[in-house]
């Protein structure tokens, strides 16, 4: 049994909502549309970890970011090439997630998310 890649309790993610002060001095609290992901172990392999940052934007951006955050590790674990060709698997997974958004019930017409994902193995 190989040693764990990370010590138990050594990983974490933090995200915080912000605010905006308008030109007339009003304070407007903004919905936090960002999500972070640490999926360990991942891909059904003890030494594989998926890290991700999902920056939601526009209407429903927080929902698109949350949906994408949940779907990336799930779909990567199911992809037949995730261990042998993770670059191709990630490309396929993002295309699948984008195509599945309408059926998810999330209206992403005026919103979405930008993602950065890394697989450490």
Give residue ranges: language-model regions.
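PP2C/PPM-type serine/threonine phosphatase catalytic domain
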Residues: 1-121
């Amino acid at each position: 049994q190989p040693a764990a890649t990370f010590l138990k309790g050594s990983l974490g993610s933090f995200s915080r909502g912000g605010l905006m002060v308008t030109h007339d001095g009003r304070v407007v609290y903004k919905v936090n549309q960002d999500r972070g992901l640490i999926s360990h172990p991942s891909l059904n392999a003890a030494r594989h970890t998926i890290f991700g940052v999902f920056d939601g934007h526009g209407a429903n951006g927080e929902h698109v970011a949350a949906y994408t955050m949940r779907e990336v590790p799930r779909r990567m674990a199911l992809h037949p090439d995730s261990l042998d060709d993770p670059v191709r698997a990630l490309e396929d997974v993002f295309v699948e997630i984008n195509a599945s958004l309408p059926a998810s019930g999330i209206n992403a017409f005026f919103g979405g998310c930008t993602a950065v994902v890394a697989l450490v193995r």
